[in-house]
A protein has these predicted regions:
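Structural beta-alpha unit
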Residues: 1, 15, 54-55, 72-108, ...
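Small/aliphatic-rich secondary-structure junction motif
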Residues: 1-54, 149-207, 296-301
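A short acidic, glycine-rich active-site loop
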Residues: 53-65, 207-219
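Glycine-rich, Arg-bearing micro-motifs that act as flexible, cationic patches
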Residues: 108-127, 260-286
């Protein structure tokens, strides 16, 4: 049997559960099993019931049954496996379950936390982006149309490393995603340049700087176009953008009403590990586009260290 698509549900029993709906679409389109997971632990119930073990067991059984009924309302129980957990530490429960299940993909409803709270506490989707050993699809409430619009964010390489393996993985994942869901595929490369004030300062110090930057821009445009052509993308499917990566991608996704952005994580040496998933996380906070995060070859999950 192929690896399952794992839908992680929101803990609110009455929530719409967009992660479940989209995980089911992905599973159906790839003929993969669907596994539904929810941590039903309720601290409010624990406080209300107190230390009486019989009352705790009875309350847990009622909550378990309520979740079974709710999931039956949302999907065909016979077509999916169901894990209803009871764990005070929700991230520890997710970690253990994901490592045990080894899913092909994790689908999660992206956090609604405010920007400040995201810096104070690490929400569930950020943890999964950084640490899950498989692709992670972070979804918003908006439903996909019958033909979803898929954008692959690509960095095709540098002069020193002309073939970027992660870019290939991202493009393949985006292509498969679009094909399986009968969607349309586009690809974009973002040239992350200095802001205008810095360019003016550098231009005054180095007279030929602007000419040199034009050559650099053209070099990366040509490299991206060659990469796209080599991998079957037509001129009408590719776009070169300029600006800070995350806000530029988010703005482009909004302007073209993209449904899913496919990005790769950055997993470098120890001092740079905080950068892992930074682009994906920033886009999630800026746009309503769903984000599929692809891990690089040889990715070492901190959960498996």
């Amino acid at each position: 049997m192929s690896a399952a698509v794992l839908a992680i549900l929101d803990s609110d029993l009455k929530a719409a559960q967009p992660a479940l709906h989209k995980a089911r679409q992905v599973a159906d389109s790839t003929k993969a099993p669907l596994h539904v997971l929810v941590n039903a632990y309720s601290s409010a119930m624990v406080r209300a019931v107190g230390v009486d073990h019989e009352r705790q067991d009875a309350a847990r059984a009622q909550i378990h049954k309520a979740w079974q009924n709710r999931i039956s309302e949302l999907t065909d129980r016979e077509r999916c496996q169901l894990s209803i957990l009871w764990h005070k530490d929700s991230m520890a429960a997710l970690r253990e379950s994901i490592l045990d299940l080894q899913p092909a993909m994790v689908v999660v409803h992206t956090s609604e936390e405010s920007g400040l709270r995201r810096h104070l506490f690490t929400p569930r989707d950020w943890q999964l982006i950084r640490k899950a050993p498989c692709p992670v699809l972070c979804v918003h409430d908006r439903q996909w149309p019958s033909s979803p619009r898929i954008l692959a964010a690509l960095d095709p390489g540098t002069e020193e490393q002309p073939e970027n393996a992660l870019a290939l993985n991202v493009l393949r994942a985006a292509d498969h995603f679009a094909s399986n869901l009968s969607g349309g595929l586009r690809a974009a490369h973002v040239l992350d340049e200095m802001d205008d004030s810095l360019i003016l300062l550098v231009g005054e110090a180095i007279p030929d700087y602007s000419v040199g930057m034009d050559k650099v821009r053209q070099f990366y445009r040509d490299r991206f176009q060659a990469f796209a052509t080599d991998h079957g993308l037509g001129p009408d499917q590719i776009t070169v953008l300029t600006g800070p990566v995350a806000p530029t991608l988010a703005k482009y996704c909004e302007e073209l009403d993209m449904d899913v952005l496919v990005v790769g994580t950055v997993h470098r040496n120890l001092p740079e590990r905080l950068l892992l998933g930074a682009t994906a996380e920033s886009v999630i906070t800026r746009a309503s586009t769903d984000v599929l995060v692809i891990k690089p070859d040889g990715f070492q999950s901190p959960w498996q260290a």
